Structure formats: C-alpha cells, structure tokens
Amino acid sequence: MNGDLFKITLISVIAILLAIIGGLISADGDPVSIAVAIAPFALAGLYMMKEKVWYLWILIPPLFIPFSINSYAPLFAYSVVLPFYLWNVMLRRSSLTWNSIPLLDTFIFLLFIHVAYVFLTHPFGLGINILEDYYGGKGYIMFLQALLAYLCLSSLKTTSQELGKVLQWSIALILLFTLAQTARPLLSPESAGPEAGTDGDTRNFSYLAISVLVLQVLILKYSVWQMIKCPWWGLLAASACAGILISGFRSSIAIILLLFFIVSLLYKRWFVSIVAPILGLAMLMLLSSSKTLLELPFGVQRILSVLPFLEVSSQAREDAMASIQWRVEMWKWALDDREIFIQDKIFGDGFARDINILKANIYEEAYHLTNTNQISFAWNGLWHSGPISTIQAIGYVGLTLYSIISVIGMVYAWQVGRIYRYSKYSLGILFVTTLYFIRPLGFFFLYGENTYIAEDIISLGIIKVLFCCAKREGLYISIHMRREYVPLMIQQKEEKPGLPSSSGIPC
C-alpha cells in the first residue's frame, strides 16, 4: 500500500514539473515547442496503456479528420505505437500471431512488390500541383503506411469482441471530428475561403461529409421499420438525405443507396430491398408529373437528372451531362496511345509527376494559353476515375492485382459481415466490412483515385483480423470441412428415447 502511494506521489510530482516546463517551452506558440512539451505526456500515456496500446492504431486516425494531413494519419499512428507494441511483446504482456488468409496475403504482397518496382523505375520527385497543393510522392507514402498497417494488423492477437469495441469507439470519434470539420467553416467563414461549401451558388456541399456519415451509421444500426417507430431517428435520416441531395453529388447518393441495398441483403430484408426502390420511383414519377421537381434546389435536380424519365430543369440536366462528357473526353486522352499523358500503361508512370511538364503547364495557365482546365487536370493525374488514375500510377499490372484483391476482399467482407451482424459490436464491424464491400464498386464505376487502394488495404487488414478471430472462436466453419456422415436410420434411432420393457428392465 505504501509502495503504491509512493509511486503515485512520485508520478504526480514529475507530471507537475513537466507541465510547468512544457508551459514555459510552448508559451511562444511554436508548433515544434508545443509538440516537445506534449511529447513526455504522450509517451507516458503510451507506456501506461500496456497491452492495450494497439487500440491507438484504430483511434488515432479519426483525430486527424479536421486537418489537411489526415491522409497520413495511419502512418503516424502505426509508426509511433509500434515500438510500444513490440516492447509489450518483449515483456510478455502480449503475444504475436499471424492472421493468415494465404490467397489475400499473396496478392497484396505482389502488389507491394510491384509498387516497389515502380518506385525504383520512377523514384520520388517533388512535383507542383497548381490546382491545390504541393505533391510528388504521396502515393508511395500512402502505400508505405498501408504496408506497415497491414503487417501490424496481421500480427495482432485479439478477440472479435475487443476489436469490435474499439471499432465502435472509432465511429464515435469519426462522428465527433467530422462534425468539428463541418462546423469550423460555418462558425469561422474567413478560415474556409470564399468558395467553401458552394459551387457557383448552385450547389451547397457544406453538410455533405457529416450527412453521408450520419446516414451510413443509421442504415447500419436501424432498419426502416425501426426508424419509423422512432421518429427522431427518422427525422435525422431525412435531414441527412437532404444534406446529400442539396450537394448535387450523384456519387454520394449512389453510395448510400448501394449501402442500403447491401445491408438489406445482409439481414435478409427482402421486402424492404424490393419494395423501397419501387415506392421511391413511384413517388418521384408522381412528383415529376405534377412539376414539383422543378421547384427543388438545383443540387437535387442535378442528382435526379440521372433518371431520364423525370422532368427536371434543362440547366440541371445540361450541367450533369456536361460533367459526364468532360470526364469521358479526358479518359479518351488517357487511353489514346497518340497522347503522352500516360507514358507506360503496362507498368505505370509512378506517383511523382515530371517537373518539366508541370512547369510548362503552369506557363500555359498563367498566360491563358489553354481555354479549359481539362489539360491541367490531365497533366496532374486528376482523372476523376479510379481505373484511369491507377493505370497512370501502377499500370495495367497494378490495376489487375487490385481487381483480384478487391474480389477476394469483398468475399471475406461479406462473410465477416454475416458472422458478426447480430453481435454486440455489430455497428463497428459492419462499418468496416460493408463500406469496404461497396468501395471497389464505387472505385470502378463511380469515382476513385489510385491512393484509395492503400486505404482499402488497411481496411482489409482489419477484416482479416476479424475473420481469423471468427475461426479461432468457432464462429466460422469452412465449407470444405464436412462432418462425419451418419446414416439417417441411425440418427433417428439415437434421437428416439428408450421405451421401458414389460419386465421393467430398460431396453
């Protein structure tokens, strides 16, 4: 007892001293000084978490959502936590394992080998993206953090309940920090820029991120009937739908509809999955016949213009068609061998851009030598297409490997979703599995970038851990395992209770 009191007192004194020193160091507001001041407390916290330190692999990335460097959050999380994770293994507080799915592991490591080859033939070089920000080898860094995360998750020994609990906590953090990201430009417009959240005064996507996230969580957590019985959830779902519709982003509403359909199939809600689309189309046709759709905001009409039998404003339909034609024209450039936007379509041009080409592009833009920004998007690899951007970076070889990985991953994501759909932490698990299941579909048919591949590999690492946990816990039985055959007559004889004989002696 006295020993514990002494430890608590000693730690408290040291913490007070570090707090005073940290306050003096960070008084000037320098980010480096603040980081130095916070570092001792962060390291102490990592040490005190002991075998639970791997929780931070899942919980740290959501904290970066409001910041521009959120793409690199997994690299920070896994690289900082890994030494403490291995330290606990050395002290035997926890142990390592290998969560193995041989076929998936093989193709993922083949993809990493191919990316390494592309890096050696097209090394990292600093490029300038005149549309947004500086970039060059971001794709290589994304794949590096994906490799680190996949190896760490593959070595993680845990239970499905524990991992599901952490995933559920992460959803709460994602909601909180996405809300902060949404509120910041609304509360402080000067920090968001003059065009933040709008597109030519016709579309408003200020609430798009939080609306999509809220609706995803509601679809995963509640059925349509539950939302009807609880008006508050139904009202929240309707508000989220409105936030997506006024944005005018057709891909966002397509992802939500696809998620709704997948979840309905997962829970075998056949009636809802069939009747809901029919009722929705009937209502839209009724509103269209009464000219009501023409009074809706521009963003809503732009989304509905995808259905040719609905009557929307000509401006909304023309804007939507122009967007499609604009992209298709760029895609033709990319696949045309006479053009030079993609040099090596087989193995890829890598993730870094040629600085000389970009300088020429800057010159043309500065002197208005080009009358469209299509050229700028093309030179900078902003194709608005997952397959095209992947071909430019890692070629047909990389695209083929990713396609195979996606098919394998979707199979395991579906299996994991079916196994844990009724578990205590089903929300956290389904948030990973179902969103991954629809991710390749969106990548190939809606919108995607080559960096999405690295993000998908991290999700696959989590799915692999959940699948291996299910095998260890007896929740999954392989279809290749057959039970011992017992003839039907013997089964009936064993199930039939013994009848007493006339002599009173059991038969």
Please place each PLM-identified region on the residue numbering.
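Helix-loop-helix junctions and helix-breaking kinks within/between transmembrane helices
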Residues: 21-33, 68-78, 200-205, 231-272, ...
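Long extracytoplasmic/lumenal interhelical loops at the membrane interface
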Residues: 191, 321-325, 329-394, 413, ...
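Hydrophobic transmembrane alpha-helices and their immediate junctions
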Residues: 105, 377-383, 393-437, 499, ...
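A juxtamembrane structural motif centered on a specific transmembrane helix
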Residues: 1-7, 230, 415-430, 434, ...
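N-terminal hydrophobic segments of proteins, predominantly signal-anchor/transmembrane helices
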Residues: 44-144, 226, 431-438
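Membrane-interface helix-loop-helix junctions at transmembrane boundaries of multi-pass membrane enzymes
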Residues: 49-52, 90-106, 219-235, 267-275, ...
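Alpha-helical transmembrane segments of multi-pass inner-membrane proteins
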Residues: 39-44, 145-190, 200-267, 504
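A membrane-periplasm/extracellular boundary helix in multi-pass inner-membrane enzymes
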Residues: 242, 246-247, 264-318, 339-340
